[in-house]
């Protein structure tokens, strides 16, 4: 994958102020309009700029191969599931080469993806995923993040809690030598979780894709080869 964005960079777009638009929503809109990865995703058919983050993770660590079972937590709008579907060459009629995606928000169908419109934190959701998975997973991936508050310490802790929940679930469903990928925000409180992950996986890395905004504290935890 190339990160050459020369064909996707537009002139800076200014956003007119509006009485109905908050400062934060105006800033978000300005970032979207001037983000080359947003433009690239639109042109290349990906549902979100987050697709390029997973592509970069794969380019770095080579985790995805055909004939895999993958669980995608917090999947909407489907960018990561799209990428995974392409990388494992998923199809709608394969039992051993499939992706199970979970989110409260609906996503449009993707080849080889079985979507569950559920709250991951509801009591029966894990049981349902395990039932649909019908065996052990090769990869559990989570791009879940809490709604940001603008307070970095709060956002850090909230997203870390989501990562911890995803990690505990991954331990239940991953096969030996399976992999776990999850978003966290840097902030200092992640060290305890990292130590737990290192006890369960042979290799644990931090990775910040170039497609992650430079001002963001997000990084990705990449845990390789479950013990």
Curated annotation (Swiss-Prot):
Uppermost EC category: transferase
Record carries keyword Cytoplasm: yes
Superkingdom classification of source: Bacteria
Enzyme Commission number, as recorded: 2.1.1.166
Tagged with keyword Cytoplasm: yes
Subcellular location: Cytoplasm
Keywords: Cytoplasm, Methyltransferase, rRNA processing, S-adenosyl-L-methionine, Transferase
GO molecular function: rRNA (uridine-2'-O-)-methyltransferase activity
UniProt-annotated catalytic positions: 183 (proton acceptor)
Gene Ontology terms: cellular component: cytoplasm
Reactions the enzyme catalyzes: uridine(2552) in 23S rRNA + S-adenosyl-L-methionine = 2'-O-methyluridine(2552) in 23S rRNA + S-adenosyl-L-homocysteine + H(+)
Residues annotated to bind S-adenosyl-L-methionine: 78, 80, 103, 119, 143
A Pfam family recorded for this sequence: FtsJ
InterPro entries recorded: RNA_methyltr_RlmE, RNA_MeTrfase_FtsJ_dom, rRNA-MeTfrase_E, SAM-dependent_MTases_sf
Major subcellular location class: cytoplasm
Family: Belongs to the class I-like SAM-binding methyltransferase superfamily. RNA methyltransferase RlmE family.
Entry function: Specifically methylates the uridine in position 2552 of 23S rRNA at the 2'-O position of the ribose in the fully assembled 50S ribosomal subunit.
Name of the protein this chain belongs to: Ribosomal RNA large subunit methyltransferase E
Organism (species): Rickettsia akari (strain Hartford)
Gene name for this UniProt entry: rlmE
């Amino acid at each position: 994958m190339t990160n050459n964005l020369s064909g996707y960079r537009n002139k800076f777009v200014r956003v007119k102020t509006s009485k109905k638009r908050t400062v934060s929503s105006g800033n978000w809109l300005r970032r979207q309009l001037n983000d080359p990865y947003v433009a690239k995703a639109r042109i290349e058919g990906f549902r979100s700029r987050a697709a390029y983050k997973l592509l970069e993770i794969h380019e770095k660590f080579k985790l995805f191969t055909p004939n895999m079972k993958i669980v995608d937590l917090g999947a909407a709008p489907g960018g990561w599931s799209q990428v995974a579907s392409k990388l494992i060459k998923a199809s709608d009629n394969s039992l051993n080469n499939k992706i199970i995606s979970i989110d409260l928000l609906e996503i449009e169908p993707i080849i080889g993806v079985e979507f569950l419109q559920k709250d991951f934190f509801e009591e029966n959701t894990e049981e349902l995923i395990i039932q649909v998975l019908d065996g052990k997973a090769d990869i559990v991936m989570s791009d879940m993040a809490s709604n940001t508050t603008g307070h970095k310490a709060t956002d850090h802790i909230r997203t870390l809690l989501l990562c911890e929940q995803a990690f505990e679930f991954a331990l239940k469903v991953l096969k030996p030598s399976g992999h776990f990928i999850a978003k966290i925000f840097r902030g200092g409180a992640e060290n305890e979780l990292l130590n737990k992950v290192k006890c369960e996986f042979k290799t644990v890395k931090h990775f910040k894709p170039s497609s992650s905004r430079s001002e963001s504290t997000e990084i990705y935890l990449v845990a390789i080869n479950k013990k």
